[in-house]
Amino acid sequence: MKDVILRNSRALQYICAAKKNFIMENGFVSESHSKMLICHFSDMHCDWKRFENVLSVIDYFSPTFAVHTGDLVCWDSQDDTQYFFDRIRQSDVPIYNCIGNHETFRQNEVLSNACLHGQYIRPLRHIQGDDYGEGYYYVDFPEYTVRLIVLNNYENEDVPVHYMRHYEIRQKQADWLIATLKECEENGYAVMIASHESDQEVPPNSDTGGFCQRYSPFPWSIPAPNEHHIVADIIDAFQYGKALKNEYVWSASGATVQVDCRFEKKSEFICYMNGHRHGDYIGYLPAYPNQLSLGVTCAGCFPEGYHNIGDETSDLPRIPDTVSEDAFNFYGIDREKKEITVVRVGACVNDRLEERLYARYSYGIDK
């Protein structure tokens, strides 16, 4: 733990700054550390050495929560991930998980949503709204009036082979999401959404803050399978307190989703958090420029086996047993300014010698 903390000393200063307030109100300085602090890591791919590094920083800072946005396994659900669940139970910080595309199969077997929920979601602590047991849930943080919603991007369990299981939000989850957001509207909760993939991809080189790499290499450069923006459309209605009525037909499966909802007042959406693309892609959705998406590169840096998962599709060099073997983010949430401070722990210098250490992004503001 000590080595990880010492070699990231600059990042740790920025994390401290990200959670600090220094505001004068009625002649007094406001509470100095009242911001929500979040750790976001993704695509661990069974790299337990680097996972221990993530845990070291989580335990050192005690953020409000941490979330891993999918692909715990090295290749598929034949891989043993019990170590992850054993270790997060030992942490005082609540750590959550999303289902990734690599979890959805075991060799040639396509796994049901119920099976995925039992293996990757049910072991988590203090989750709510998971009555259906199909990979999605939420967690409330009353002290901040924030709800974290975790989605299952891969509901299409009826595919004949696993490589046809693309991003699809089906009717039941869409209805559940609307009902969950209506509770937030009623109770005045702001919303964050975590999932393996973003509802719409942030294009490469689309961010001036430095946290969006220039290219999206194969196979992540193929046309996005998520041709519909069901979640983003619903969030837009939630943000602006308006109605949404639409029918969506997924081209791969032919499945139809009917959305007919109305929100009565404007509500606060903070951001999406996702991974999957093994690169940094922070920016705003092209369809909704006021919806911020925080896409993080993979936390794993596994040089053994078929490739170095951290290095091959990212503009960041990832060298085992150095500071660059790690790559994960901390976020400080400023609800008053509607601003998120992003701080990188680990690899933060790209191939152009540009530093990717910190940046600030507004959210929920019309552009």
Question: What are these language model-derived features?
Answer:
Residues 25-33, 139-142, 261-263:
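Short boundary motifs at domain starts and secondary-structure transition points
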Residues 43, 70-71, 100-101, 151, ...:
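Active-site glycine-centered loops adjacent to acidic/histidine catalytic or metal-binding residues
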Residues 2-83:
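N-terminal active-site segment of His-dependent metallophosphoesterases
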Residues 38-40, 66-68, 97-98, 193, ...:
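Residue-level marker for buried hydrophobic side chains located in beta-strands
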Residues 45-46, 103-104, 153-156, 197-201, ...:
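Short, solvent-exposed loop/turn segments at secondary-structure junctions
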Residues 2-22, 32, 286, 306-367:
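A short C-terminal boundary segment appended to hydrolase-like catalytic domains
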Residues 28, 59-65, 147-149, 161-287:
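His/acidic metal-ligating clusters that form di-metal
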Residues 78-182, 217-222, 230-233, 237-240, ...:
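Extended active-site neighborhood of metal-dependent phosphoesterases/phosphodiesterases
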